[in-house]
From Swiss-Prot:
Polycomb group (PcG) protein. PcG proteins act by forming multiprotein complexes, which are required to maintain the transcriptionally repressive state of homeotic genes throughout development. PcG proteins are not required to initiate repression, but to maintain it during later stages of development. Component of the PcG multiprotein PRC1 complex, a complex that acts via chromatin remodeling and modification of histones; it mediates monoubiquitination of histone H2A 'Lys-118', rendering chromatin heritably changed in its expressibility. Keywords: Developmental protein, DNA-binding, Metal-binding, Nucleus, Phosphoprotein, Zinc, Zinc-finger. GO terms for cellular component: nucleus; PcG protein complex; PRC1 complex. A zinc finger (RING-type) spans 263-302. Residues 199-215, 676-689, 929-938, 1116-1133, 1261-1272, 1352-1375, 1561-1587 have a biased composition (Polar residues). The modification Phosphoserine is found at residues 656, 658, 1139, 1253, 1266, 1274. InterPro entries: RAWUL, Znf_C3HC4_RING-type, Znf_RING, Znf_RING/FYVE/PHD, Znf_RING_CS. Disulfide bonds: none annotated. Pfam families: RAWUL, zf-C3HC4. Residues 1036-1045 have a biased composition (Gly residues). GO terms for molecular function: chromatin binding; DNA binding; promoter-specific chromatin binding; sequence-specific DNA binding; zinc ion binding. Component of PRC1 complex, which contains many PcG proteins like Pc, ph, Scm, Psc, Sce and also chromatin-remodeling proteins such as histone deacetylases. This complex is distinct from the Esc/E(z) complex, at least composed of esc, E(z), Su(z)12, HDAC1/Rpd3 and Caf1-55. The 2 complexes however cooperate and interact together during the first 3 hours of development to establish PcG silencing. This is Polycomb group protein Psc. It comes from Drosophila melanogaster.
Length: 1601
């Protein structure tokens, strides 16, 4: 029965026996002394041997934190609880005490050892030992144990009373009696200290108070023995508590630490401590750096340091230690830093606040600092339940400002004095932050600030709890201050009662006295305060098993006391209530109920108070082992110990609640079976439940809400109810009867908490208990999950989990249909995260308890719940998925698009168009669907796909991430973070092996799709290696229009077909995909996928349908990812999809497209990226352009773009707006372009030079890839020609329809001028416009850029025209003539030259742009203007335009045509890189642009010609022809690369060598100022690159004509 400690202490017990031979029961001596010897081991043994040792031990005991107390207290506390009534208990509970002692000792040993270790017991022991030595030896031994360090006088009085009591009780030698008294008092104090050790830190004060109250408790026991002793003890206890409060570990002097915190170079404290990694020697940073400049070795050792790369590191931890150890060092260092930087304001501006001496962390404290703190009562819940007006004042926190060296003991003293708390009877714990962190008395505020990292951001928040220290059995809930008078009276009454009880206990040491004692105690209780009742309980429990009814009364009285102990009135009430034993139970029951509720919330430890007989009977059998094992498992959780050692351990537990549990709440409803007593056998009966109850109690001790579902046996149900302390205690200690009573109590106490809270708390408890708990609780847990799961499910789902899953199933599909839909649906899945849980509780038959509980249950019950859980999420989703599959199933693209659109397609496949529009721009989406379907079969497939895909592209770009997030959130019920994919869904649904029926293969698919979804942003690289950035831009905002890409106006037109690149990019994404027919194919893997993939996607449908994949969102994402990512991720993504068999994503034509798609995507992205840079410029320019002219060109451009798109490569023509520009460049500078894929990154000059080349390269790629698909069709196809012609919206009707929304914007843009410019960039024509501006003429030829160019030309007119518009208009007729001539030329084989002159005219148009460039900033035109150095040209142009005549314009045009013929030929040669289709298309494109240029740009051309003349005159360029001539050679020489550098500033399209004479001249000028222009033009250059291609394309276009 004796624990190893008690056995080890037996020798001491023997000595004690020897001294205590006279003790009536030697067994008592053994058991008590053994257990008490643990506490008294040193105390009692030393009592006989060393009085000083006794005082030390008593200090250890009283401190409850002492290391000696660790061993001694562990047993003594354990024993103490058993032997709480000193001699009475000893006689009565001799055998029971031994048994309980072993159990309690084991449990308490573990608890106390851990707690004591936690409390830094050894330190306390030293200080307390010193204090203890002050007390007189023998007498001090007894009183010291009770009263930590009581004065000798008090000790003498206490010793006398103890001796008298001892003599009365059993004529034992005074030494023995003092040993017993000290052992009992120490046991009481140790029990209080054991409970205090449960809260090690509080116990010190507690133990002090416990010791003072140890004096009181021992005194109660003693006071029962002698009232005088109680008085003396109380007086001594007060002093003791002060002594103990002041007692602290011997301080370590700074001199002992100095060698470790000083720098050996400067012999000062370390500043900016820096450690050499090899030898770990630390020095000041400045000292070490100076040393290393001279030496190569560590200053303290010979470790060689590499001067080149010294391996030294800043040691912030060591520096913090130095600052914390050395008072004032940190403040002085801050002052030095401030003084240093005060004289160096320049350096201070560059220094960080820390370097300047600003205390940003506020983590270093000084002893002189003032710390603000709040002190509030920890058990407000209890007070509120039965609070009285007097207590209201205690509810509000007290705010104090104390010096940093203020100790916790001072705060305790403040509370004692503030509320007039009797230090003898009550102990106070001070907690910080959390009510489980009990602080040691010697802690200073600075210590606490360092230990718990107070950051001065708010007052330190301290809690205090008051509890009755003398009661070893019951650890009172925080007891309020009781008037000293009441306390004294109660003590006297208790003393009298004890005397009576002692006599009875002497007569009947075993259980016989129970009845008598019960009667006496009951009478006394009626007459006396609750404290007496508690004492009686102790007596009854310790002396003899009192009637269970009495126990109930006592326990409830105890509970009442706890509740009411907060206020003296409460205590008196409890005493009155407790006075009638049976009646008390009824009044106290409500109290108990309240207590139980509080305990549930606060994890109240339940101390089972049972008769010694029960202890003997129950504990020895099962409770001891269980309690030991449970205590071991639970590390001294008082609850487990209380449940295990029903009576004695219950007593101990009350005082030894685990530090984690709130001791005040610990209510020992030990075996309070029912108000009426229950047979002593009940403990045995409960022992089965007992094992569980300790667990539940233990869990309670950890603040677990222990409401368990009543599933299996009533006992287990009660155990689960252990949630309510009364029920668990009853369950533990009581037989079924007690269960019934407890049920009543617990239900009455907290019917909701018992029933519903049970499920909640129980689920949590289950989650925790199953781990610790025996299989029984696990048994309970599977049934419990039914209730628990409901609670566990998110609160939102808790009720509608069943319905939630069906709802989710249907709603899930709609969410995929639209991203917005997805969000709410995601909310539903998340809110209805229940769907998986609902399956869980449906299948498991478990109710959802608490959301928190639910996850643990899912984890626990994964084997049980998984089928329901995983299928449910999918079951909810699968219908949606099936719908998606069915809706989109007809077309793989649809599925993909639907998935991309976040199931917008899935839910509404026909809606795909709508969702697309919604995702992007309503108008573009519709046109996209029309063109894609009307233009190609792919268009239909892409119509579904593009519809799904284009919007999804846009969505995949903009909404793509959203969809991924939505989808992931859908599956996860918001559990998955935005970046997380559906795989995270697994927490709800365990992963099943493929063989298991619950295994959802398609589930994996969603995971893959999700990841596919993730890569989709990367498709940039997939679209084009160089275009990854653009693709991301497209994904994110609009690859083209400055990432707004266009709101979609222009991108949507193309983006419908270009949906892939980043339809979100708007025009740019359109450009990207149009960049190659591949654009659709590339960006819209749908193009290739459309045919074969549909079949594959049909398969996918089958997969989804067959698998019932519950990942509609992710599934949609997956497919969309294939389609959306196809361009870039085709290769990588497709493999991913392929790798899982589930990946219907295998719907792949992805690999087929990658080549074209990659290049097309690159081209598109490159185009897009340049336009992205340009959009702002275009925006600025757009306002000026004449709306009418601008509108037609965009329309024509759109038409053109659409016709190419309508052909297979309908996309490439659309790209031509962005992309056609690129192809021209591509053909001439295709080589250079290949070299310059980085154009966006290139420096302005490089960008000007190289950007064209990258675009050319992209154009070449696009040309090579898309010529067959779109170029052949676009140029050759009548529609393309028509489209190129301004009216060519016929083929482009879908595109024209697409662009019409855009065109209106364009119209509005010129009209709105400043307003629309912004729109223009959004439109995505803006990026194109920028290229158009760069190419002034070619852009208009470009379909997208043509609109931009037209706008720009018009805008330029407006911008310049605002100043020189009349002149421009005047010049416009000649320009028109020239253009007409150019048109004629273009009709002829020579038209390319005229077109080039037209380009040249365009160039003037750009030049004017450049003049406006400051406004439009970095438009390609502005770039040309800047390059021309004609930022001032706006003035010149105004005058020059007026001066220049149509003849000059005509001459310039002729020269340009003549010069450009060769250039055109050369360009055509380069165009060979581009497919003839690209040539044809570009030619047609250029025709249209030229016509537009003629229309809109005649004035601009005239202006430009005049400008050229002016530039020639002013710049020495000479006539335009002269300028053109120089340019021609330049063009010829660097056809791909050299010309672009010269031309790129102005006409990156022409740089390919297509530069027209006119274009060349401006370029020459541009070159002169290209340095300046390039900087601005870099963005414009990007635009120019886009524009350059059209310029380059112009010759081919002209040729085709």
């Amino acid at each position: 029965m004796m624990t190893p400690e008690s056995k080890a202490i037996q020798p001491a017990a023997a000595t004690t026996k020897q001294t205590a031979e006279a003790t009536a029961t030697t067994t008592m001596a053994h058991t008590q002394q053994k257990s008490q010897l643990s506490t008294l081991a040193k105390t009692t043994t030393t009592t006989a041997t060393n009085k000083a040792a006794k005082s030390v031990v008593s200090n250890a005991n009283s401190s409850g934190n002492n290391s000696s107390k660790k061993l001694a207290l562990s047993q003594s506390q354990k024993t103490t609880t058993t032997t709480t009534p000193p001699t009475t208990t000893t006689t009565t509970t001799a055998a029971a005490a031994a048994e309980a002692t072993t159990n309690a000792d084991k449990m308490q040993k573990q608890q106390q050892l851990k707690q004591q270790l936690f409390a830094a017991c050894s330190i306390k022991v030293k200080s307390e030992n010193t204090l203890a030595t002050t007390a007189n030896a023998a007498l001090a031994a007894a009183t010291t144990t009770t009263t930590t360090a009581t004065p000798a006088l008090a000790t003498g009085k206490a010793a006398k009373t103890i001796l008298e009591n001892g003599i009365k009780k059993e004529s034992t030698p005074p030494a023995v009696e003092s040993v017993e008294a000290s052992s009992s008092s120490s046991s009481s104090s140790s029990s209080s200290s054991s409970s205090s050790s449960s809260w090690p830190t509080t116990r010190r004060a507690t133990s002090e108070d416990a010791s003072s109250n140890g004096g009181a408790s021992a005194d109660e026991e003693k006071s029962e023995e002698d009232p005088t002793a109680a008085v003396a003890a109380s007086s001594t206890a007060t002093t003791t508590s002060d002594l103990a409060t002041t007692s602290r570990p011997r301080p370590v002097l700074l001199t002992a630490v100095n060698p470790h915190i000083i720098c050996h170079l400067c012999q000062g404290y370390l500043i900016n401590a820096t450690t050499i990694v090899e030898c770990l020697h630390s020095f000041c940073h400045s000292c070490l750096i100076n040393h290393l400049r001279k030496e190569r070795f560590c200053p303290r050792c010979e470790m060689v340091i590499n001067n080149a790369k010294p391996n030294i590191k800043s040691d912030t931890t060591l520096q913090a230690i130095v600052y914390k150890l050395v008072p004032g060092l940190y403040e002085r260092e801050l002052m030095r830093k401030r003084a240093f930087y005060k004289d160096r304001p320049e350096e201070a501006a560059l220094a960080t606040p820390e370097q300047r001496g600003d205390d940003t962390e506020h983590l270093i404290f000084s002893p002189s600092d003032d710390m603000s703190l709040s002190l509030e009562y920890a058990e407000l819940g209890e007070l509120k339940t039965d609070s009285e007006p007097e207590l209201v004042d205690t509810l509000r926190p007290r705010y104090l400002q104390c010096p940093a060296m203020c100790r916790v003991s001072h705060l305790k003293k403040f509370v004692y004095d503030k509320f007039e708390i009797d230090a003898q009877r009550f102990s106070i714990d001070i907690m910080y932050k959390v009510k489980t962190i009990v602080l040691l008395d010697y802690y200073t505020l600075m210590d606490i600030a360092y230990i718990y990292t107070w950051k001065r951001d708010a007052p330190m928040r301290f809690y205090y709890r008051v509890y009755e220290s003398p009661q070893p059995l019951v650890k009172p809930a925080p007891r309020r201050v009781l008037p000293l008078k009441l306390e004294k009276q109660e003590r006297e009454n208790q003393e009298q009662q004890l005397a009576v009880e002692v006599a009875s206990s002497k007569v009947e040491p075993v259980s016989l006295p129970e009845d008598q004692k019960a009667e006496a105690s009951i009478k006394v209780e009626e007459q006396e305060s609750t404290r007496e009742i508690v004492k009686e309980v102790i007596k009854d429990v310790a002396a003899t098993p009192p009637t269970e009814t009495l126990k109930l009364v006592i326990n409830r009285n105890m509970l009442d006391k706890r509740e009411k102990s907060h206020s003296p009135q409460m205590s008196s009430k409890s005493s009155s209530k407790s006075s009638p034993c049976t009646p008390v139970s009824s009044p106290s029951e409500p109290n108990i109920k309240l207590k139980i509720d509080l305990s549930k919330q606060n994890s109240v430890t339940i101390i089972d108070m049972s008769d010694p007989e029960r202890r003997e009977i129950v504990k020895p059998l099962k409770p001891e082992k269980e309690s030991r094992s449970k205590k071991k498992d639970k590390d001294g959780s008082p609850k487990s110990s209380s449940s295990s050692s029903s009576s004695s351990s219950g007593e101990r537990k009350r005082k030894s609640p685990s530090p984690l549990t709130v001791p005040p709440l610990t209510i020992r409803t030990e075996r309070i079976m029912s108000p009426s007593g229950v047979s002593t056998l009940s403990p045995r009966v409960t022992s089965g439940a007992f094992s569980e109850d300790p667990k539940s109690e233990f869990l309670k001790s950890f603040a677990l809400k222990p409401i368990k579902v009543k599933v299996e046996s009533p006992e287990r149900t009660l155990n689960n109810r252990a949630i309510t302390p009364p029920s668990p205690s009853v369950q533990q200690s009581a037989s079924p009867k007690s269960k019934g009573n407890n049920l009543d109590d617990s239900i009455l106490m907290k019917p909701p908490s018992c029933m519903p809270p049970k499920s909640i708390a129980s689920s949590k408890r289950k989650s925790k208990e199953p781990v610790k708990a025996v299989s029984k609780k696990q048994k309970l847990s599977p049934p419990l999950p039914t209730v628990d799961f409901k609670i566990r499910l998110p609160v939102t789902n808790g009720n509608s989990s069943g319905t939630a899953s069906p709802k989710i199933e249907k709603p899930l599909m709609p969410p995929p249909a639209k991203p917005p839909m997805l969000a709410p649906r995601k909310l539903q899945p998340s809110a209805q995260f229940a769907p998986p849980p609902s399956p869980i509780h449906h299948h498991a038959g478990v109710q959802m308890s608490a959301p928190g509980n639910r996850t643990p249950i899912a984890k626990r019950y994964q084997p049980i719940l998984p089928k329901a859980s995983r299928p449910n999420p999918f079951a909810n989703i699968p219908n949606d998925v099936n719908r998606l599959l069915k809706d989109a199933g007809t077309e793989i693209k649809s599925i993909g698009g639907g998935s991309v659109e976040n199931n917008s397609n899935a839910a509404q496949k026909p809606h795909l168009y709508g969702p697309k529009g919604e995702s992007k721009m309503g108008p573009p989406a519709l046109p996209a669907t029309t063109p894609s379907q009307g233009n190609k079969n792919v268009g239909k497939q892409a119509g579904n796909l593009p519809m799904s895909a284009p919007p999804n592209k846009g969505n995949s770009s903009n909404n793509y991430l959203n969809l991924a997030l939505f989808n992931s959130s859908k599956c996860k019920g918001k559990e998955a973070p935005p970046g997380c994919r559906t795989p995270m869904y697994t927490p709800n649904s365990p992963i099943y092996s493929p063989s298991s029926p619950q295994y959802v293969p398609s589930y994996n698919i969603p995971t893959m799709p999700t990841y596919k979804y993730t890569p989709k942003p990367t498709p940039n690289s997939g679209s084009g290696n160089g275009g990854s950035g653009s693709y991301l831009q497209n994904m994110l905002g609009g690859g083209n229009g400055g990432s707004l890409g266009g709101l979609f106006p222009s991108p949507p037109t193309k983006s419908d077909q270009n949906t892939n690149p980043a339809q979100g990019g708007g025009g740019s994404s359109s450009a990207t995909q149009s960049g190659g027919n591949n654009g659709i194919v590339n960006n819209n893997i749908y193009m290739p996928n459309e045919d074969a993939p549909e079949k594959q996607q049909v398969k996918v449908k089958s997969l989804l349908n067959s698998c019932n994949i519950n990942i509609p969102s992710s599934l949609s994402i997956t497919i969309s990812r294939d389609n959306g990512d196809s361009s870039s991720p085709n290769n990588g993504q497709h493999p991913k999809h392929k790798s899982p068999v589930n990946n219907y994503i295998e719907i792949v034509k992805l690999p087929d497209q990658p080549q074209d798609q990659v290049q097309a995507a690159k081209e598109a992205q490159k185009r897009q990226s340049p336009p992205a840079a340009v959009p702002g410029h275009l925006a600025a320019k757009l306002p000026p352009p004449p709306p009418s002219k601008a509108i037609p060109s965009p329309q024509h451009l759109v038409s053109r773009m659409t016709p190419p798109q309508l052909p297979k490569v309908a996309t490439p023509p659309p790209p031509s707006s962005p992309r056609v520009i690129t192809p021209p460049k591509t053909s001439p500078p295709a080589n250079a372009a290949k070299v310059t894929p980085l154009k966006p990154v290139l420096t302005p000059t490089q960008v000007d030079k190289k950007t064209p080349s990258p675009e050319k390269r992209t154009a070449a790629q696009m040309g090579s890839h898309s010529p067959t698909a779109s170029e052949n069709k676009s140029p050759k196809g009548g529609p393309a020609g028509v489209a190129n012609s301004t009216g060519g919206a016929q083929n482009g009707d879908p595109a024209a329809k697409k662009f019409r929304p855009i065109l209106p914007r364009q119209n509005g843009m010129p009209e709105l001028a400043p307003k629309l410019p912004t729109l223009a960039p959004f439109v995505g024509f803006n990026p194109l416009q920028n290229p158009a501006a760069g190419k002034k003429v070619p852009p208009s030829k470009k379909s997208p850029n043509a609109g931009a160019a037209a706008h720009q030309s018009g805008q330029q007119k407006l911008v310049n025209g605002g100043q020189s518009q009349p002149a421009q208009q005047k010049t416009s007729p000649p320009a028109q003539k020239n253009q007409q001539q150019v048109k004629k030329v273009s009709k002829n084989p020579t038209p390319p030259p005229p077109s080039l002159p037209a380009v040249g005219k365009m160039m003037p148009h750009p030049v004017m742009h450049s003049q406006n460039a400051p406004l439009s900033i970095a438009s390609s035109a502005s770039a040309a203007a800047v390059a021309s150095g004609q930022l001032d040209l706006s003035n010149f142009l105004k005058e020059n335009l007026r001066r220049v005549h149509a003849a000059q314009a005509a001459q310039a045009a002729q020269v340009a045509a003549a010069a450009n013929q060769s250039n055109m030929m050369y360009n055509l040669a380069q165009m060979g890189h581009m497919t003839p289709a690209m040539y044809n298309y570009q030619q047609a494109y250029f025709r249209e642009q030229l016509s537009r240029m003629q229309r809109v740009g005649n004035e601009v051309f005239n202006d430009y010609l005049q400008k050229l003349k002016t530039a020639a005159a002013t710049g020495g360029g000479g006539p335009v022809e002269g300028e053109l001539k120089p340019m021609l050679p330049t063009v010829t020489l660097p056809s791909p690369g050299a010309t672009p550098p010269a031309a790129s500033p102005k006409t990156s399209p022409l740089p390919a060598g297509k530069l027209t004479a006119a274009a060349t001249a401006p370029q020459t000028k541009g070159n002169s100022s290209s340095g300046a222009a390039n900087a601005r033009q870099q963005t414009a250059a990007t635009g120019n690159n886009g524009a350059t291609v059209p310029a380059a394309s112009l010759p081919p276009a002209t040729k085709s004509k």
